[in-house]
Amino acid sequence: MSFILPSESIDGTHPCNGLHMNGQDSLVQPLLTDFYQITMCYAYWKTGTHNEPAVFDVFFRKNPFQGEFTVFAGLEDCLRFVENFKFSQSDIDYVKKILPENAEPEFYEYLETLNGSHLTIEAVAEGSVVFPKVPLLTINGPLAMCQLIETSILNLVNYASLVATNAARFRQASGWKIQLLEFGLRRAQGPNGGLTASKYCYIGGFDATSNVLAGKLYGIPVKGTQAHSFICSFSSPAELKVRLLNHKITNEKADLFQISMEKRAWLLDQFSWKAALSEVSDGELSAFVAYAIAFPDTFLALIDTYDVIRSGVVNFVAVSLALHDLGYRSMGCRIDSGDLSYLSKELRECFVKVSTLKGEYKFFEKMSIVASNDINEETIMSLNDQQHEINAFGVGTHLVTCQKQPALGCVYKLVAQSAQPKIKLSQDVTKITIPGKKKCYRIFGKNGYAILDLMMLEDEPEPQPNQQILCRHPFEESKRALVNANKIIKLHNVYWKDGEMITPLPTLNEIKEHVNESIRSTLRQDHRRYLNPTPYKVSVSERLYQFLHTLWLQNAPIGQLE
């Protein structure tokens, strides 16, 4: 099975993204579902309700990571899934095996006819900041067909939105000047988890990935250095088989190792290092030279294999100056262990000293320092408090596995059937659904930031700027406010109707830009802060409030006491 590039096509007409494989070998296909979706589909068909028009909302109840915002992601994957939805003959044969023997054969004929042509999908733009209870997608169509796609839709939205949000939080913590590199493939939950993580970490705010396949499939910049094993593979200069490097301008060959040795000896005489020559590893120097010969224009060395201060930085500077003599410029160094703040400041101090040795070494004071080593949000904020000198973070485990919260918890709920509203009740008020087909708006105040999201019944007149709007908490009667909107944005667009895309889909880079813009222009700083962020308000109109509570009372059983 081979992955298809985003610009390529399964059948010559329909583009396909990297989550999908050739034809019915796709990872995302009709049988990527829970068994009870198929049993419910059969029950709907058996009772003749399978074609009744239905409306389902996809939403979540609580923002992840103890924060107050979520980044919506996975919309294109959902649309591609619906676009390519079709049971194969082998799918039908398998369903026959798992359903009871007395299931009517006509049901399988019905399954063969199913596709996404009768569905209508409205959604928030991918990459938007979203909040609890507001529908991310609203799916209209035949009841059974809507039911069949539930699990797949949730699978495509839940993790994508979770990891994109996690990436956005890392970006918020690090600031906008730091480069963020996603190094999570080896720690991800399987190959598809790794690909999904790379894609959605990129839109969430990361600059590049180490995942080569993600780079191929999605056009994400690919970055990487070397592992400790590469450094350890050289024990002495005798193992360095190639030492010559062509000068970048003159093309004359020079012995890079010999020049590096001379630079190292010269450096140790120039100022007081925290290292003696006897402590500096010749094997490490050999490894750096080998890598520099292979990549003279992009040399970035891992310097903590033995000792950052007593060996790594000395060898790195020596090789970098040797490269400079041959017309090349090193990119920087990486540290993967130890006290990252202390080491980064020591490295920067060293680089500044080197930059003063000769005018032509001025570039060294800006040499890039990359840090990795199990980095999370808290680590970055602590490093910020310590005024670190790091230019880039390589983040893996805590990013792609979302260790702080492993699931978002999106749900897929029936809100209308045959034009009749549907409501799910619960003793836990937060789990009561908001019934009916709705339209949603984002209300902005005079300071330019969003005040709240407002849900209204579909047939209500649109709210207007500069007019007071009564906004109510869905469940708490006393929480209400009159809002004078400076600007109002409708949140949903129709993306899929009558078997085709209605709204053009943005590129990955356009989604990435939208995430950045959505967070910075929508949310006040107090909504974004790490500790005790201010909750963002999600409200309902007066009519929807009354509608919800009337339906709630109509459906809630009346208890009897004796």
Curated annotation (Swiss-Prot):
Chain positions recorded as nicotinate binding sites: 36, 183, 225
Top EC group: ligase
Cofactor: Mg(2+); Mn(2+)
Keyword Cell membrane included in the entry's annotation: no
GO process terms (BP): NAD biosynthetic process via the salvage pathway; response to oxidative stress
GO MF, one annotated term: transferase activity
PTM annotation: Transiently phosphorylated on a His residue during the reaction cycle. Phosphorylation strongly increases the affinity for substrates and increases the rate of nicotinate D-ribonucleotide production. Dephosphorylation regenerates the low-affinity form of the enzyme, leading to product release.
Residues that coordinate or bind 5-phospho-alpha-D-ribose 1-diphosphate: 397
Pathway(s) annotated for this protein in UniProt: Cofactor biosynthesis; NAD(+) biosynthesis; nicotinate D-ribonucleotide from nicotinate: step 1/1
Domain of life of the native organism: Eukaryota
Keywords, in A-Z order: Ligase, Magnesium, Manganese, Metal-binding, Phosphoprotein, Pyridine nucleotide biosynthesis, Transferase
Cofactor binding note: Activity is highest with Mn(2+).
Catalysed reaction equations from the record: nicotinate + 5-phospho-alpha-D-ribose 1-diphosphate + ATP + H2O = nicotinate beta-D-ribonucleotide + ADP + phosphate + diphosphate
E.C. numbers: 6.3.4.21
A single cellular component GO annotation: cytosol
Positions of modified residues (Phosphohistidine): 228
Family: Belongs to the NAPRTase family.
Primary role: Catalyzes the first step in the biosynthesis of NAD from nicotinic acid, the ATP-dependent synthesis of beta-nicotinate D-ribonucleotide from nicotinate and 5-phospho-D-ribose 1-phosphate. Helps prevent cellular oxidative stress via its role in NAD biosynthesis.
Name recorded for this polypeptide: Nicotinate phosphoribosyltransferase
UniProt source species: Caenorhabditis elegans
Encoding gene (name): nprt-1
